[in-house]
Amino acid sequence: MLKTILLLLTLSCFPLLIACTNSEDEVFEVVTKMASIVGPGGTQDDHDYYLEHITDNFNSTWGYPTVADCAADIEECIGDSPLDPPKKQTLKVDGNTATITVAATEQSPTGDTFKLVFDLTLVKQDGVWKGDTITAGDDKIPSGVDLVPLELNEMLFSYDPTDVRIKSGKFAFHIENKGDQVHEAVLLHIKKDAPLVELMETRDPEGVGFLGVKVPVIPGADAKMAIPELESGRYALICFLPDQSAPGGEGPPHFALGMVSEFEVE
């Protein structure tokens, strides 16, 4: 009798298991395809696929409040950088919502490659899985490295530059966006004894060094940012994203509105 009950319970779970597996396969197929699509040089079929698999919300923080707005400026909306092939082990499906971690291999101003990590959320609408939000994901933080709180807001970085962990040069940031706009945290090494804005204006490669970036951090989101161990000297946090409260979301860059901050490592 007990064996019969267990068998019936097991068989009753099969449809749920199959449904879950099918949903995971469907989501992963969409994400894999979306990761490969680029704007400039992309095919019409690829662009159509992209538009069919995003919600109005997906690009709203970048000045495209609807899918139709994205379609009208498709190459710029999608961009020219494909994502790395996704890994299925990071995929989680819960009903009509799914999340997955994706990454992009980028090149720094010095020519070095680095990884950007993103958390992508998809929703199922009318039987179709669509990208709904994308925000910066967590970096792997080495054991023994402390997290220093860093809040993003309009238009400032909130943290304690006198924190002994920052002064030591061995730390990572736990970033939280407490504002209403999308922000980023770009970490720079100021190598010359001159104002940061002056060095940026001259674009002197010997004056400022790029160390990392966490982007985009959408309102209400948080992310852990790994940082290389810093030597003694001046460093800066800066946000280059445009003021999204301006018409079309293309206002002046946040740093021009005050979102720049310096700290020193001893």
Could you say what each language-model-derived stretch is?
Residues 175-177:
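Asparagine-centered strand-capping/turn motif at beta-strand->loop junctions
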Residues 169-173:
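Structural beta-strand segments of beta-rich domains
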Residues 115-143:
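Short beta-strand edge/turn micro-motifs at domain boundaries
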Residues 19-37:
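Short, low-complexity N-terminal intrinsically disordered segments enriched in polar/charged residues
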Residues 70-113, 119, 137-138:
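Surface-exposed, charged secondary-structure patches
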Residues 118-120, 144-154, 158, 167-168, ...:
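Extracellular/periplasmic metallocenter environments
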Residues 8-16:
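Bacterial N-terminal signal peptides
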Residues 42-71:
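Short, well-ordered alpha-helical segments enriched in acidic and aromatic residues
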